[in-house]
Amino acid sequence: MHFPVFIMQNHQRRALVLFSGGQDSTTCLAWALDRYAHVETVAFDYGQRHRIELDARLNVLREIRGRFPAWAARLGQDHLLDLKVLGQVGDTAMTSDRAIEMQANGLPNTFVPGRNLLFLTLAAALGYRRQLDVLVGGMCETDFSGYPDCRDDTMKAQQVALSLGLGSRVTIETPLMWLDKADTWALADSLGGESLVQTIVEESHTCYVGERGQRHDWGYGCGECPACVLRKAGWSRWAERAPR
């Protein structure tokens, strides 16, 4: 797959990246830094079982600032918002210690109802205050677990609702929407080369159960939860296409 090269001078808008510290959001952060004049990041502490991601994201930010001077010049403030109420309204395997399994509705019990809708609403409110009119998220409906709040139709509807509700234009960018996980690895490579790929492998965190003791070719994780399965399979497919 060919990925276009974005020239920063053509895009002077300011962006806020929903940045959890996982593979997808790290790739989206690189994409935004390659495209926009000023980029800030926001994460949410919602009582997630894998809250180690909140530490991982700081390591990713440190590496990006150290390895990519041009991006570091565009990378602004990082924000962390408290959203623990999500654990109260949506008791799931993402916020409590229980086995991960499929439900009768076809969704895994890691689905946190309304999570991305709340994330985007709060991000838009923060962006409004800080003049950041582009929201960038790693939502995808290609290689995904079926979460309805990751779908393109949901993002388009949310963009309209936020723009109307705030009385100003809000753009939601989802650069991974139509990419599978192999394409996501390839996009990271095209944006930041081996240095970015290794940052994602070593520093990002995707595993739902918070496992950092097992190191694989594709990074750290249990290797069995839905997030690890997708990340591992994507790495394998990408490695077959472009042997390292």
From Swiss-Prot:
Its EC number is 6.3.4.20. Zn(2+) binds at C207, C222, C225, C228. NCBIfam families: 7-cyano-7-deazaguanine synthase QueC (TIGR00364). Catalyzes the ATP-dependent conversion of 7-carboxy-7-deazaguanine (CDG) to 7-cyano-7-deazaguanine (preQ(0)). Pathway: Purine metabolism; 7-cyano-7-deazaguanine biosynthesis. Binds 1 zinc ion per subunit. This is 7-cyano-7-deazaguanine synthase. The gene is queC. HAMAP family: QueC. CDD domains: QueC-like. It catalyses: 7-carboxy-7-deazaguanine + NH4(+) + ATP = 7-cyano-7-deazaguanine + ADP + phosphate + H2O + H(+). It is an enzyme of class 6 (ligase). PANTHER family: 7-CYANO-7-DEAZAGUANINE SYNTHASE (PTHR42914:SF1). It holds the Pfam family QueC. One of its GO terms (molecular function) is zinc ion binding. One of its GO terms (biological process) is queuosine biosynthetic process. Belongs to the QueC family. ATP binds at F19, S20, G21, G22, Q23, D24, S25, T26, T27, C28, L29. Keywords: ATP-binding, Ligase, Metal-binding, Nucleotide-binding, Queuosine biosynthesis, Zinc. Its cofactor is Zn(2+).
